[in-house]
């Protein structure tokens, strides 16, 4: 693929390498380091003049440092005369701060959008934004890809009783997501209504739907401390579900999440690799990973060639 360069930030080099391999490319040379005062320094190690540049950096790990690193990499490529700079952000940082839900609350997702644009990004590729309206925070093109086709493929290949399952949303906000998956599998859906008083603390859960004598599959875009989905799993089991799975696009997994998952009644907690999971998997055999590198790689190929990416909304590329 001529006139294209792919660079990796520090957050998820394994995913970046998989994307490059699928495109038959080498990752571009870049050196990132910190000065003694903790300022980030980036050195692009090869010419990008006239190139179509893609920088892969996920919003995970040391989020603030990685975001700053991404901004500097974008700007470094832009002022080095790259023809176009696309930020490939599998898990978009600050996506949960997408609205003014109380007095004096910041809309930090909008701030991040502004920062990316000012740094010089011409295009954004991301996956399963926590709130789809974040696309409207940008004045540049944003392709919000979906993990749904890969999730459907995993369910059909790994859950033998998938025809006798119920797709469950752990909250009312995810109803659209689970109904889409349930419709494509031609199965029922349910949701759990939760009343929350404090952050990450669930006081009461009400199941709306039937899971008796069925496999229950909890689906959500992300999980952080996993308090909600672990309580939801208990609720589903007590309502008669035979087995419970959780499938999540972004496994943030912070705090005491490993012990919670190990002690929960899940058959498996399945996440995509928008965030690195290797260390977590060493301590929790229930965590399984769906590789989405082929989706991001195909989105990059289609973008570079001026083709539509809408095919990826319903298909997993080979």
UniProtKB/Swiss-Prot annotation:
PROSITE patterns per the UniProt record, alphabetical: PRPP_SYNTHASE
Regulation: Activated by magnesium and inorganic phosphate.
InterPro entries in the cross-refs: PRib_PP_synth_CS, Pribosyltran_N, PRibTrfase_dom, PRTase-like, Rib-P_diPkinase, Rib-P_diPkinase_bac
Cellular-component GO terms for this entry: cytoplasm; ribose phosphate diphosphokinase complex
Main enzyme class: transferase
Binding of phosphoribosylpyrophosphate, as annotated region: 212-227
Cofactor requirement: Mg(2+)
Residues the record lists as binding Mg(2+): 128, 130, 139, 143
Keyword match Transferase: yes
Enzyme nomenclature, EC number: 2.7.6.1
CDD domains to which the protein is assigned, alphabetical: PRTases_typeI
Pathway recorded for this protein: Metabolic intermediate biosynthesis; 5-phospho-alpha-D-ribose 1-diphosphate biosynthesis; 5-phospho-alpha-D-ribose 1-diphosphate from D-ribose 5-phosphate (route I): step 1/1
GO biological process, any: ribonucleoside monophosphate biosynthetic process
Domain of life the protein comes from: Eukaryota
Functional note: Catalyzes the synthesis of phosphoribosylpyrophosphate (PRPP) that is essential for nucleotide synthesis.
UniProt record similarity statement: Belongs to the ribose-phosphate pyrophosphokinase family.
Name of the featured protein: Ribose-phosphate pyrophosphokinase 1
Taxonomic source organism: Macaca fascicularis (Crab-eating macaque)
């Amino acid at each position: 693929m001529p006139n294209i360069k792919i660079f990796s930030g520090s957050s998820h080099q394994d995913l970046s390498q998989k994307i490059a391999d699928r495109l038959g490319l080498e990752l571009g040379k870049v050196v990132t380091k910190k000065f003694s005062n903790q300022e980030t320094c980036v050195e692009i190690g090869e010419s990008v003049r006239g190139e179509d540049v893609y920088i892969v950096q996920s919003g995970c790990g040391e989020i603030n440092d990685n975001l700053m690193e991404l901004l500097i990499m974008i700007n470094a490529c832009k002022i080095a005369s790259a023809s176009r700079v696309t930020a490939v952000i599998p898990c978009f940082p600050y996506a949960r701060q997408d609205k003014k839900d109380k007095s004096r609350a910041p809309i930090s997702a909008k701030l991040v959008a502004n920062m990316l644009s000012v740094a010089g990004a011409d295009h954004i590729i991301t996956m399963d934004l926590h709130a789809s309206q974040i696309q409207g925070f940008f004045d540049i093109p944003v392709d919000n890809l979906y993990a749904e086709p890969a999730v459907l493929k995993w369910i059909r290949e790994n859950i033998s009783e998938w025809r006798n399952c119920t797709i469950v949303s752990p909250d009312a906000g995810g109803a659209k997501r689970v109904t889409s998956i349930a419709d494509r599998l031609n199965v029922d859906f349910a949701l759990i209504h939760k009343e929350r008083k404090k952050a990450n603390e669930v006081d009461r859960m009400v199941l709306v739907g039937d899971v008796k004598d069925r496999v229950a599959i909890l689906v959500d875009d992300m999980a952080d401390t996993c308090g909600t989905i672990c309580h939801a799993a208990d609720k589903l089991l007590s309502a008669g579900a035979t087995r419970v799975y959780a499938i999540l696009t972004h496994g943030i997994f912070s705090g005491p999440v490993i012990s919670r998952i190990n002690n929960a009644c899940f058959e498996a907690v399945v996440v995509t690799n928008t965030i690195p999971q290797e260390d977590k998997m060493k301590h929790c055999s229930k965590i399984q990973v769906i590789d989405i590198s082929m989706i991001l790689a195909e989105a990059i190929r289609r973008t570079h060639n001026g083709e539509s990416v809408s095919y990826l909304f319903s298909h997993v590329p080979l």
